Design a protein with these regions (language model features):
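Nucleotide-activated chemistry modules centered on ATP-dependent adenylation/adenylyltransferase
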Residues: 1-32, 37-425
Length: 425
């Protein structure tokens, strides 16, 4: 893990220097924009440099359908403000998203054409769909799309994608900057960059900003628009550190689901009708213990952790149950390989928290949390079926292009030989 080093310049100056260096070195540049406070400040800073240089940059906003109306209004305002200097990519296409508030629909698809009558809102005019991107396959995951977008937009040139994450937000985001695994995967040794595919780099210009820095920037630049939903969050008493925007049903994002019916009741009613489990999720997500699987959990009287795990599995829909059983088998097999002939009922909590020991209690906690990909067991989310479809289509296109190129060269050689023969005659 990298060591934090302090410098004698402020974070605003440092961010501007990173942006200048990026513009100096990359031929193609795009901004991944969400409408949140961090990406808004980052976009203002990037556009400041783009306008100064007279360069156009692409702005990618992936619309998840389930968004605050205030966020959509802010996106409109930002796109209009910088319309002369951006290439807009407001993307509304079916994407598979996590739904952590129910076992009956553990994933939902935004902009699902089969559920058009239940859409939370209509697509905005001029938005882009899967038809605008040759790599797009309906049902792709968000994380897969953004990587492929960078590769497609770069067209083989050196490309930078500005990402507005901050290390303060989570350990995962801190590791995106500080981990030693980035060795050889940065641009020019800059730890605020990450190589994601060939000749495409993520750039994190505000990674060292604190939440207070974000709002200090807006206080000093009142002419720069910000998302008005944060003003409503302040009025609702939400702490600055807990003010997050994203699709509302994810494993972490669901904690803010209750805010919708307070801040935007008109949007809330549509969310409840659109996504399974939205209402119950908002009611219980602030609870602890067995209701959500957070903090200390207990087993029913007369049950072991193993029998409680099996009881929880039996209450689930077959498809969801089969998914967890397959994941648990992988978990148990992995620990068998490390010398555990049997899985203990429980282990010291500090070892369980660090994933250093297996236990049936850990499996129960995964089920109670609706941890669909079993990240609490040290497992990761696999590539989606849509991504596999894209890979097959890409390989088929490349093979066809290679075949056509071979045929073209073959015809050129034949014509050349014919021309030479006629010249001799």
């Amino acid at each position: 893990m990298g060591v934090k080093r302090f410098s004698d310049i402020d974070v605003l100056t440092a961010a501007r220097r990173r942006i200048v260096e990026t513009f100096d070195n990359f031929q193609r540049i795009y901004v991944a924009f969400s409408g949140g406070k961090d990406s808004s400040v980052m976009m203002h800073l990037v556009m400041e440099e783009a306008i100064k240089r007279g360069r156009k940059v692409a702005v990618m906003f992936i619309d998840f359908e389930a968004q605050y109306a205030e966020t959509i209004a802010h996106i409109d305002e930002m796109f209009a403000l910088y319309r002369e200097s951006i290439e807009p990519h407001w993307i509304c296409m079916p994407m598979l998203l996590r739904n952590a508030v129910t076992n009956y629909e553990p994933r939902w698809t935004c902009w699902d054409e089969t559920k058009r009558d239940a859409w939370i809102r209509e697509k905005p005019l001029g938005c882009k769909t899967e038809r605008d991107y040759p790599f797009a396959v309906p049902g792709m995951e968000f994380e897969e799309f953004i990587v492929l977008f960078g590769e497609w937009y770069g067209q083989g040139e050196l490309t930078a994608g500005f990402i507005g994450i901050r290390a303060q937000e989570s350990l995962h985001r801190y590791c995106a900057i500080a981990t030693w695994e980035k060795k050889g995967k940065t641009f020019g040794g800059r730890r605020w960059t990450t190589n994601i595919v060939d000749r495409v780099f993520n750039v994190y210009p505000i990674y060292d900003w604190l939440t207070e820095d974000i709002w200090r920037y807006h206080a000093r630049h009142p002419d720069k628009p910000h998302n008005g939903i944060y003003d409503r969050m302040n009025q609702a008493g939400v702490k600055l550190s807990q003010q997050r925007l994203c699709q509302p049903f994810g494993d972490d994002q669901r904690r803010g689901l209750w805010l919708y019916h307070i801040l935007e009741p008109q949007t809330w009613f549509k969310l409840v009708a659109r996504v399974n489990g939205a209402n119950s999720g908002s009611l219980y997500i602030e609870e602890k213990g067995n209701i959500t699987g957070y903090h200390k959990i207990t087993k029913p009287d007369g049950h072991t952790w193993k029998s409680f795990c099996n009881l929880l599995l039996q209450t689930m829909p077959k498809k969801t149950r089969d998914h967890y059983v397959a994941r648990f088998k992988k978990f148990i097999w992995g620990w068998h390989q490390r010398g555990y002939t049997t899985i203990p009922e429980e282990a010291p909590p500090e070892l369980e928290a660090k994933c250093w020991a297996p236990s049936w209690r850990r499996m129960c906690k995964v089920l109670l949390r609706n941890d669909y990909w079993c990240k609490g067991l040290g497992q990761a989310q696999p590539k989606s079926e849509a991504y596999g479809t894209y890979i097959r289509l890409r390989d088929a296109r490349r093979a066809e292009a290679k075949r056509l190129e071979h045929e073209r060269k073959k015809q050129e050689r034949s014509q050349r030989r014919l021309f030479d023969a006629e010249a001799v005659a």
